[in-house]
């Protein structure tokens, strides 16, 4: 870990289906696809472990070379304010708060239990998506609903993409030579899911996602902020079945819902700029505008901003989105350099002019490194 070197990377897809497969890459070498039916997470991790020790594809000689396993866990609720070593008590608590994010949380637990079954003595660490945001003050995380609902059901803003916001905010300060604990930063993690965070003097003071990852800015298939009265109105007009509401707000809305084209920004940009489709163009304007509004709001919340960071798949690759968000904000101290921005992909780069009061920078995220570093730190103790 002293070198932060990636020995291998990959992932298993379609667990539980006949056409499940493992994507594997040894270092920077050729990518391999191993097709094998994996009925559950235990079988998936068995294949991962056998691949890591394989004579041709592997990077370790035996499983004893593995010192620990780190897990990205969606939700830590109010119980986990930082990464923790996993034990039976932690597993029970993760399961207890699973209703806050049932799909992801149960999958996270399956991975933890599979490792425990296969390598029972191996230390495991949980790194929570929500933990970095636990410094948000109560006036920012509470919803304006009866307080008893917060007390009974823990309904509040939690925020997500925590490892990404943590990594890129610190890395941006390293690149710019700024003291992280004396800097006001707005981080924009923009991918198919998107969230912003306001970080003041090393602590998150607000973030755009809420109880679930659906709140906040417009996303690929999620609606983001919406008047909740829309839903009883749709129900009363038989335009939406209450049973379909979750699917409606999470999978049918956002850029996909408005454009009618795709949730993939590349497809939508082609429709807007090449085929001149009005709905596609509208969805892009809405997307940029809503992110820009949050940038302005967080500047107000912190009484200023020193650094604006773009990351995530679109934030790292999408010069059109970065332009739409950061241009024409001169009165807020942002002098955007579109010459540097245009065509920039997957590189650490300052994209504001030297005279800009607010530095704008692209920082590719590295959530896996955060998980590895936290795992190392906790298992070294």
Briefly describe each language-model feature range.
Residues 200, 206-241, 247, 312-343:
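Catalytic phosphate/nucleotide-handling subdomain of diverse soluble enzymes
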Residues 281, 285-309, 315-381:
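Internal helix-turn-beta structural module
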Residues 247, 254-258, 265-301:
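Adenine-nucleotide phosphate-binding core of ATP-dependent small-molecule kinases
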């Amino acid at each position: 870990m002293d070198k932060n070197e990636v020995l291998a990377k990959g992932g298993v897809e379609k667990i539980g289906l006949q056409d499940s497969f493992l994507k594997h890459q040894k270092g920077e070498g050729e990518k391999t696809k191993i097709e094998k039916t994996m009925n559950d997470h235990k079988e998936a991790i068995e294949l991962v472990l056998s691949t890591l020790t394989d004579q041709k594809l592997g990077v370790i000689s035996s499983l004893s070379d593995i010192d620990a396993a780190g897990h990205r866990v969606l939700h830590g609720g109010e119980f986990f304010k930082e990464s923790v070593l996993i034990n039976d008590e932690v597993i029970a608590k993760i399961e207890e708060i699973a209703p806050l994010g049932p799909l992801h949380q149960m999958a996270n637990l399956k991975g933890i239990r599979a490792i425990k079954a296969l390598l029972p003595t191996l230390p495991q660490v949980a790194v929570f998506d929500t933990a970095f945001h636990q410094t948000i003050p109560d006036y920012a995380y509470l919803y304006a609903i009866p307080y008893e609902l917060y007390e009974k059901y823990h309904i509040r803003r939690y925020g997500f993409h925590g490892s990404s916001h943590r990594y890129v905010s610190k890395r941006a300060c390293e690149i710019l030579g700024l003291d992280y604990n004396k800097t006001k930063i707005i981080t924009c993690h923009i991918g198919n899911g998107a969230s912003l965070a306001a970080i003041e003097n090393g602590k998150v003071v607000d973030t755009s996602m809420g109880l679930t990852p659906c709140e906040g800015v417009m996303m690929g298939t999620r609606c983001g902020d919406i008047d909740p009265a829309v839903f009883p109105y749709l129900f009363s007009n038989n335009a939406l079945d209450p049973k379909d509401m979750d699917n409606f707000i999470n999978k049918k809305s956002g850029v996909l819902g408005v454009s009618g084209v795709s949730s993939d920004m590349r497809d939508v940009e082609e429709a807007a700029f090449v085929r001149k489709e009005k709905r596609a163009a509208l969805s892009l304007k809405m997307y940029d505008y809503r992110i820009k509004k949050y940038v302005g709001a967080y500047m107000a919340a912190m009484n200023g901003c020193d650094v604006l960071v773009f990351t995530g798949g679109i934030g790292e690759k999408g010069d059109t989105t970065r332009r739409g968000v950061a241009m024409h904000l001169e009165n807020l101290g942002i002098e955007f350099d579109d010459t540097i921005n245009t065509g920039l992909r997957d590189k650490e780069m300052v994209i504001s002019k030297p005279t800009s009061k607010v530095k704008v920078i692209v920082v590719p995220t590295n959530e896996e490194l955060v998980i590895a570093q936290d795992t190392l730190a906790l298992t070294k103790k």
